[in-house]
């Protein structure tokens, strides 16, 4: 069955709904372990950025991921569920697929989209890449 569940989150409501589904599923499958994964997208490393600007960007990312992961922990605590949190840096789709494959997750539960439609058309959605390239089963949540 599904004993290892990976839930990538990006702060979108869809990603929090995915976590709600994972928490619900874990109440039905007593041995299920949930890991919440947040990915910091690569910081642009253009030569025009000063070290001060890069530090500010990094601090902004840190505040954001801390806020998001704290919300995930609160959601889990309300239902009496334990979760693990993991932070990675890089391309979201590649990191989700790579981490899932490396840790042998049985199921990835993720939001169907986290960014605007226009941006998805240009670069392709993370969820679409994960569906087509992950070895694990994938459940998309709207």
Regions found by a protein language model. Give the residues of each.
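Class I S-adenosyl-L-methionine
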Residues: 23, 66, 70-77
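Structural beta-alpha unit
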Residues: 74-108
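A short acidic, glycine-rich active-site loop
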Residues: 54-67
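Short beta->alpha linker loops
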Residues: 52, 87-91, 113
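Phosphate- and divalent-cation-binding pockets in alpha/beta enzyme and binding domains
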Residues: 17, 95, 117
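Conserved beta-strand positions in the Rossmann-like core of class I SAM-dependent methyltransferases
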Residues: 35, 84, 139
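Gly/Ser-rich helix-loop-strand patches that form or flank binding pockets
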Residues: 4, 98-142
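Small/aliphatic-rich secondary-structure junction motif
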Residues: 3-52
